[in-house]
Amino acid sequence: MPKKVFQQEDVEQKITENFEPKQEFEQDELDIEMDCSQFETTMDRQNTDIPFQHMVRPKVTMWQKLLMATICLFSCGILAQSVQWLVDSWRDNQWIAFVFAMVSLFLVLLGLGAIIKEWRRLVQLKKRLILQEKSREIRSKSAVNLTEVSSEGKELCLKIASLMGIDDKSPQLIAWQEQVHEAYTEQEILRLFSQNVLIPFDRVAKKLISKNAVESALIVAVSPLAIVDMFFIAWRNIRLINQLAKLYGIELGYVSRLRLLRMVFVNMAFAGAADVIQDLGLEWLSQDITAKLSARVAQGIGVGILTARLGIKAMEFCRPIAVAPEEKLRLSHIQTELLGTLKTTLFSANKVKEKVR
C-alpha cells in the first residue's frame, strides 16, 4: 500500500467543514410534534367498546320499519279473520267450524300476548342500556360542570332502585340516602350508590361467576366425551346469564336473551385474546404446574377462563350503573381459585388411585 502524506492545512480544512453555524429559534416559531403512536395504541385498546355500542343500538333503517309495519298489519289481519270466522260460524250454526274458530282465535291471542311480552322485555333491556349510558355521561363530566347542585344523579339512582325491585326500606338504600349530602356532585352520588347498594349484588354475581367457571373447568377436565362437554358448557353459560340477569332485576325473554348473548359475544370478539392475556398476565407461564397438567386439564382451564369472561361481560351489561375501573372484576381474580380447585381435586384423586394400586 503506497504511503500517503497529509498536510496540516488539509486536516484543519476538513475539521472546519464538519461544523455548522449556530441557529437560534424564537419561542413563537417552535412547532413541537409529539409521537402519539403509543397514545393511539393505548386509546385503541381502551375504546374497543365504541364500535360495539353502535352494534348494540343500531339505527333503525327504512327497510326495518317497513318490515315491522308489515308484521303488524299481518297480525291484525289474522286477528280480524279469526273474529270474522267466529262470527260467521255462530250465525250459520256451524258448530264444528265455530270450535275451530275459537281455537284459532285463542292461538292468535296467545301468540300476540307472547309477542307483546317479548317486546316489553326488550324495552326493559333497552332501558337498562340507557341507564348505563347516563351513568357514563355523568362520570365523564368534568368537575367544573358539577359545581352546582343537581338532583339528576339522585333521581337516576332512585330509578335504578325501583327497576331492580329494591324496597324503599332496604338497609342499604336507607344508608345511601343518609350519606347523600346536598353539596355532593353527581359523580359522588353515583359512587356512594354503587358502594352501598350495588356492591352486595356484585359480590353475589362474582360468586356465581367463580362457581360456574370452576365447575365448568372440572367437568371438562374429568369428562371423556367432547360432545357432552359442549352441550354442558352451553347449558351452564346460558344458565349463568339467566342468573345474573335475574340478580340485577332483568326479566329475559327468548328474544331479549338472544340479544344479550349477542351483546356479550360481540364484546368478547372485540376484546380478543390479547385482553385475556393482559388480564391474566404471564403468571401462569412462570408456574411449574404446566409440566404436570395433562391436555384434558388444560382444556378445563381454558373453558373455565372463557366461562368466567362470559360471566364478567354479562355482569357488566346487566349492571344498571357502568362498572368503574376499580370495581371491575378481572380474570386474574378467578385465577387462584380455579387453579387451586383443579390441583386439589385432580391431583388428590390421582394420589388416591396410586395408593389403591
UniProtKB/Swiss-Prot annotation:
Entry keyword Protein biosynthesis: no
Sequence intervals crossing the membrane: 67-87, 96-116, 213-233
Organism superkingdom: Bacteria
Keywords for the protein's UniProt record, in alphabetical order: Cell inner membrane, Cell membrane, Membrane, Transmembrane, Transmembrane helix
InterPro entries found in the cross-reference section: DUF697, UPF0283
Membrane topology, from the record: Multi-pass membrane protein
Protein family according to the UniProt entry: Belongs to the UPF0283 family.
UniProt-recorded name of the protein: UPF0283 membrane protein HS_0596
Upper lineage: Bacteria, Pseudomonadati, Pseudomonadota, Gammaproteobacteria, Pasteurellales
